[in-house]
Amino acid sequence: MTENAAPTRAGFVALIGEPNAGKSTLTNAMVGAKVSIVTHKVQTTRARIRGVALEGAAQIVFVDTPGLFRPRRRLDRAMVAAAWGGAADADIVVLMVEAHRGMTDGVRAILETLNERRDPKQIVALAINKIDRVKSEVLLKLTQDLNAAYPFAETFMISAEKGYGVADLRAWLGASLPEGPWMYPEDQIADVPLRMIAAEITREKLTLRLHQELPYQLTVETENWEERKDGSVRIDQVVYVMRDGHKGILLGHKGETAKAVSKAAREELVEFLGRKVHLFLQVKVRPNWLEEKERFDEMGLDFRDGNA
């Protein structure tokens, strides 16, 4: 480092908020690449995904947490525990609130928990997302109400999808992190095994394709990852569903749904990995997968956190 060079900074930034608040979209926008899956359905993110972004001399490790909601199942409870665990471990917490939904009961519950868990050593900021959906006077009132409920260090108006305000937020985060060496190599954009990213990409395609409750009752695991001599990779994945009827829906007429999902997932994996991908999907019925520790381990969740 030269005498006049800025000191390096590094730290964790946890993005928290209700389901579908835009946390995964913001993570991807900050990193400049897709590391979290994004769909129009709520509760898509299940585990804590870490995306790594550079801002000048700062390395920002974004922790995209599952949405905070009232849990009903073991999986729900483990997801919420992972979200608050990510927040507790972070140097900076960013609460994301959807501008058009405003001060919901869910947001109030999160604010209440933030006040209960207040840590003087931790910075908490507010990011009001999707600002293009509301009028300025509505936005001003929401900003005042949220800041009256919690003493945020800073408030940002953003649209993660359209990129409004994202650069300003990233610059502030980089400047606010503690001085210290970088935690990851300069070219690393995620702290997630490739096997998990591959499974998440396939689950995203399933979630976009399927309807109602089925996306929440399935999981995808990468069973085999084989590097081939020609530079390509063979990926074998299993989709676990809870009922025979679910398997039929997922396969579709003459296997058309499964083929379409496989094609879409393979195309994105090729783009992500930069090489040829041979993707093979199997669908298996496993009625109690939601109660199996192995499934939670594969998703990066703590099975014990799901205890009632």
UniProtKB/Swiss-Prot annotation:
Keywords: Cell inner membrane, Cell membrane, Cytoplasm, GTP-binding, Membrane, Nucleotide-binding, Ribosome biogenesis, RNA-binding, rRNA-binding. It comes from Dinoroseobacter shibae (strain DSM 16493 / NCIMB 14021 / DFL 12). An essential GTPase that binds both GDP and GTP, with rapid nucleotide exchange. Plays a role in 16S rRNA processing and 30S ribosomal subunit biogenesis and possibly also in cell cycle regulation and energy metabolism. Residues 43-47 are annotated as: G2. Residues 129-132 are annotated as: G4. PROSITE patterns: G_ERA (PS51713), KH_TYPE_2 (PS50823). Residues 210-287 form the KH type-2 domain. It is found in: Cytoplasm; Cell inner membrane. GO terms for molecular function: GTP binding; GTPase activity; ribosomal small subunit binding; small ribosomal subunit rRNA binding. Residues 9-179 form the Era-type G domain. It comes from the Bacteria. It is a peripheral membrane protein. Belongs to the TRAFAC class TrmE-Era-EngA-EngB-Septin-like GTPase superfamily. Era GTPase family. InterPro entries: G_ERA_dom (IPR030388), GTP-bd (IPR006073), GTPase_Era-like (IPR005662), KH_dom-like_a/b (IPR015946), KH_dom_type_2 (IPR004044), KH_sf_prok-type (IPR009019), P-loop_NTPase (IPR027417), Small_GTP-bd (IPR005225). Residues 17-24 are annotated as: G1. This is GTPase Era. GO terms for cellular component: cytosol; plasma membrane. One of its GO terms (biological process) is ribosomal small subunit assembly. Pfam families: KH_2, MMR_HSR1. Residues 158-160 are annotated as: G5. The keyword Lyase does not apply. GTP binds at residues 17-24, 64-68, 129-132. CDD domains: Era, KH-II_Era. Monomer. HAMAP family: GTPase_Era (MF_00367). Residues 64-67 are annotated as: G3.
